[in-house]
């Protein structure tokens, strides 16, 4: 499907007056909530704000601006499902997750903790981009900020899992893509049979002119070329019966089941309108996981014959008060201040200027 409709979607996003960034607030293991993890006493190396990284050469690309160990580490074993839960402000049902204008892919990397902290050894274990007119971020919003990966059958030890969103609403100019990532502290307790590859360096895996980073979502296209390395062909985990895990839990038994030979991918759900309000029903559903060996797109970098996408699950969270959006008055840094059909304030806070990136999106940035 051609994506010439994304200009219309950008207009719809502007009409909603949503200019939201995002961070990972929590993690679920085998559908068990591990609680808020984005604090010094938690298990996520969280930044002090939800502002993006835009310089692909910055050391902040590794784990965002707060690459420091936190108090807790989650315990998992091969085959366990790890679900990352993203939000704009809070785990409230009314939270908008991330601006619907922030179209782009979602990827997940992992690395041994010591190497990963230093920016080395990062292995891509999952990716989800653009399929049949739907971006990974669209699916993330629909699923209330959740996407999942399977723990590979790797050696026991401590690892960092690094979920990453690349928002491409300003990707039509060099340096315009926005990167959102955190590092989740995880201990694998099973003794796997697979050796994690050497991996890549982050920063270093991307350049500002990579086809998947300098990418114009407002022009017609059929597919999306993922930046960085291919998904590791050993990324599929294995477990005879994944059990619920908790933070700092007792070591789990070693898995003896062989890992699948192909990657896992999500069965895509129908696309929804950018203006549709997210569901707040107190239900939980998990998307169907299937195997695929489809050939990679000719427009994407060379990858193995099968690819891996991020599985997503929808679940609601407890409702707490949600701050209102800034529809009037001075607009804060990084928030929208103009564009076609935009109805909010066009006056930025002192020291900021309203920068036009494209006809659909103006943003308050440092003067």
Curated annotation (Swiss-Prot):
Domain of life: Eukaryota
GO MF terms held by the record: cellulase activity; cellulose binding; metal ion binding; monooxygenase activity
Biased composition (Low complexity): 235-262, 270-287
Swiss-Prot/TrEMBL catalytic activity: [(1->4)-beta-D-glucosyl]n+m + reduced acceptor + O2 = 4-dehydro-beta-D-glucosyl-[(1->4)-beta-D-glucosyl]n-1 + [(1->4)-beta-D-glucosyl]m + acceptor + H2O
Positions that bind Cu(2+): 21, 102, 180
Gene3D superfamilies assigned: 2.70.50.70
Signal peptide: 1-20
GO cellular component: extracellular region
Keyword Secreted: yes
Application notes: Lignocellulose is the most abundant polymeric composite on Earth and is a recalcitrant but promising renewable substrate for industrial biotechnology applications. Together with cellobiose dehydrogenases (CDHs) an enzymatic system capable of oxidative cellulose cleavage is formed, which increases the efficiency of cellulases and put LPMOs at focus of biofuel research.
Obligatory cofactor(s): Cu(2+)
Example of a GO biological process term: cellulose catabolic process
Domain CBM1 stretches: 329-365
Disulfide cysteine pairs (residue numbers): 63-183
Start and end residues of each stretch annotated as Disordered: 37-56, 234-287
Keyword entries, A-Z: Carbohydrate metabolism, Cellulose degradation, Copper, Disulfide bond, Glycoprotein, Metal-binding, Monooxygenase, Oxidoreductase, Polysaccharide degradation, Secreted, Signal
Major subcellular site: secreted
Subcellular location as annotated: Secreted
Enzyme Commission code: 1.14.99.56
Binding note for cofactor: Binds 1 copper ion per subunit.
InterPro entries, A to Z: AA9, AA9_LPMO, CBD_sf, Cellulose-bd_dom_fun
Family in the record: Belongs to the polysaccharide monooxygenase AA9 family.
Record remark: domains: Has a modular structure: an endo-beta-1,4-glucanase catalytic module at the N-terminus, a linker rich in serines and threonines, and a C-terminal carbohydrate-binding module (CBM). The CBM domain is essential for binding to and subsequent oxidative degradation of polysaccharide substrate.
Function: Lytic polysaccharide monooxygenase (LPMO) that depolymerizes crystalline and amorphous polysaccharides via the oxidation of scissile alpha- or beta-(1-4)-glycosidic bonds, yielding C4 oxidation products. Catalysis by LPMOs requires the reduction of the active-site copper from Cu(II) to Cu(I) by a reducing agent and H(2)O(2) or O(2) as a cosubstrate. Active on cellulose and cello-oligosaccharides, as well as plant cell wall-derived hemicellulosic polysaccharides. Also active on cello-oligosaccharides such as cellohexaose, cellopentaose or cellotetraose.
Name the record gives this protein: AA9 family lytic polysaccharide monooxygenase A
Organism listed in the record: Aspergillus oryzae (strain ATCC 42149 / RIB 40) (Yellow koji mold)
Designated gene of the protein: AA9A
């Amino acid at each position: 499907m051609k994506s010439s409709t994304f200009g219309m979607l950008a207009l719809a996003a502007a009409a909603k007056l949503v200019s939201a960034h995002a961070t990972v607030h929590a993690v679920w293991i085998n559908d068990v909530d591990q609680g808020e993890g984005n604090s010094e006493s938690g298990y996520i190396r969280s930044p002090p704000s939800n502002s993006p990284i835009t310089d692909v050469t910055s050391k902040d690309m590794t784990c965002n601006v707060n690459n420091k160990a936190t108090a807790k580490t989650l315990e998992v074993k091969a085959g366990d499902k790890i679900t990352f839960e993203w939000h704009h402000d809070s785990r409230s049902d009314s939270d908008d997750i991330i601006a619907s204008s922030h179209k782009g892919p979602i990827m997940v990397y992992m690395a041994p903790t010591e190497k990963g902290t230093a920016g080395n050894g990062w292995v891509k274990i999952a990716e989800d981009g653009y399929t049949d007119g739907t971006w990974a971020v669209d699916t993330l919003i629909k699923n209330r900020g959740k996407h999942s990966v399977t723990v590979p059958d790797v050696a026991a030890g401590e690892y960092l899992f690094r979920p990453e969103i690349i928002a491409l609403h300003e990707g039509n100019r060099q340096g315009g893509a926005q990167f959102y990532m955190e590092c989740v502290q995880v201990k694998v307790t099973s003794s796997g049979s697979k050796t994690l590859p050497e991996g890549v360096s982050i920063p270093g895996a991307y350049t500002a002119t990579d086809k998947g980073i300098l990418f114009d979502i407002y022009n017609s296209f059929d597919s999306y070329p993922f930046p960085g390395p291919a998904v590791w062909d050993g990324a599929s985990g294995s477990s005879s019966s994944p059990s619920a895990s908790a933070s700092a839990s007792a070591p789990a038994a070693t898995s003896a089941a062989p890992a699948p030979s192909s990657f896992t991918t999500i069965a895509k759900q129908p696309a929804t309108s950018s203006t549709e309000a997210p569901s707040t029903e107190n239900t939980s559903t998990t998307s169907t996981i299937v195997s695929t060996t489809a050939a990679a797109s000719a427009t994407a970098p060379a990858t193995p014959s099968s690819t891996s996408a991020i599985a997503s699950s929808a679940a609601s969270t407890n409702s707490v008060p949600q701050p209102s959006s800034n529809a009037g008055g001075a607009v804060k840094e990084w928030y929208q201040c103009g564009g076609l059909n935009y109805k909010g304030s066009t006056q930025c806070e002192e020291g900021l200027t309203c920068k036009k990136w494209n006809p659909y999106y103006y943003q308050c940035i440092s003067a």
